[in-house]
Amino acid sequence: MNNKQGKVWVILMIILVIIVSCFLAGYLYIKSKFDKMTQKPLDESDLGIEVQEPEREEIKKTNVDNLIKFVIFGSDSRDTENAYAGRSDTIIIVVINNVQKSINLISIPRDTYVNVPGYGMTKINHAYAYGQEQLSIKTINSNFGLDITQYMTIDFSGLVNSIDRVGGVEVTLDQDEVNFINARVSAENKIASAGLVNLNGTQALVHSRNRYVGNDFTRASRQRAILISLLNKIAKKDVNEILSLSDEVLVNITTNMDINKYKDMFIEVAGDRQEYLKNINSVQIPSTEYGYDSMIEGIYYFGFDMNRAKEDFNKYYYGI
């Protein structure tokens, strides 16, 4: 398994480890784990946060003490063979809502056509290459009217094999997906038939990178489905197994999050973890329902209706 095939899957697994660790151990445990991460601050005065329409401003005031919000970036900077090298291959916004007792995972397609401040209209993942987390968050906020200030960025080296430690994940595959995996794995990792299959790490990594059966949006849908399935599987694992896994992966995260700000919220999440597990929402914004393929000077972009995208963010980000 090469590094390119594993990267998107690893970033999803990182989300799982952080959230499930929170459920199982609460604030003190999470605090000790966050201390293992590399801290890299941002200039919060230059993140593209603007005064929003009254409805959003009111909900922001109401939810200020009830939301944990951050964005996760997966960078391909170490993959010299990847056309997306140096850009954010994956962008996932995580919103933990203590009022609704829910977890929203919002993925933004990397080809989304937006205005990158200082660079003009281009793909949203180019912002990471131009200005790393600072410009990436500014781009997201300024285009969609959000107020993200916190992030996690994944260093993929040494993480790809960690998925096997949780025993894989059950997913339903059609025959085309089985054929795709089998063409890219060794004999011992080939899948016998379509249907419900428990994928090991190698198989899952290939499956998560598959954009040839369907398209890039189908791939994102696969990733989100795997994420939810794996979350429920990890939640049933022995606590010591999860602690050991988190020790291995969290040291590979760079962040600016201050866990002390969320002490009370993490304690509440830990106490009601079963409710949160019942309310995991995984969506793509902009959606393919109002997005469209666009070719500009021979380059593919994902265009979309901005008003409808903001409506979706009202629901899944602001909770309106």
Model region roles, listed by residue range:
Residues A127-E188:
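Amphipathic, coiled-coil-like alpha-helical scaffolding segments used for oligomerization/assembly
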Residues G120, Q132-I140, D155-S162, G201-A204, ...:
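Stable alpha-helical elements in mature extracytoplasmic
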Residues D65-I68, G86-I91, Q100-I108, Y119, ...:
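Extracytoplasmic
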Residues D79-N82, T122-Y130, G145-Q150, R209-T218, ...:
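Second-shell loop/turn segments in exported
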Residues M1-W9:
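N-terminal Lys/Arg-rich, disordered targeting/topogenic segments
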Residues D164-E241:
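Flexible, polar/acidic helix-loop-strand segments at domain edges
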Residues V8-Q100, S282:
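Entry/capping segment at the start of metal-dependent catalytic domains
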Residues E44-K60, N66-I68, A85, V116, ...:
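C-terminal solvent-exposed extensions
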